[in-house]
Amino acid sequence: MRYSNIPAGVFRNRFGFESLPDFSRAVWQQVKTEADGNIRNLPPGLIGGSDVAAEAVSAARTNLMGLHNGNNVSVERTDFKKLSALKEHVIVANPPYGIRMGSDENLAVFYKALGDFLKQKCKGSAAFVYFGERQYIKKVGLKTAWKKPIKAGRLDGRLVKYEIY
């Protein structure tokens, strides 16, 4: 949405400010028309995604259907280890974590595999990975560029940036 200059609240039918006493429908229409005129097309292939869960892929595709040029975003059901090289990309990942999965089994192995994928197939990229549990950050095996605390529900997680060389 940001790349395409799609205004926030584009799917809303009504805003609270429309009930204010000095609200002007003419001014609002002018602002809305100007914002809509600044929308630009999303080139095919600029954004893509994947997940191993069919439900997640289906939800992403459904959400994209209502978005301007959402059909230019490819979402596939596949394991990240099977993806082709993502050199000089921006990678955003919200991988599984123990609390969300209900189990800590094999997560250390998973995060090591994620780190190996980033090192081997993502040269020149920046990766932003959300960790619901901080103890797995070191399992990736890459030096962090920075870590930012992010609360998601009861999770005291971290968004971590990796610069892959």
Regions from the PLM with identified roles:
Residues M1-A85, R100, D104-N106:
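Conserved S-adenosyl-L-methionine
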Residues E88-N94:
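Short SAM/SAH-binding signature in class I
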Residues A85-E88, K123-G124:
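Short glycine/proline-enriched coil/turn segments at helix->beta-strand junctions
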Residues F80, P95, E133:
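Residues immediately flanking
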Residues L42-L46, S50-A59, I99-Y165:
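Conserved Class I SAM-dependent methyltransferase catalytic core
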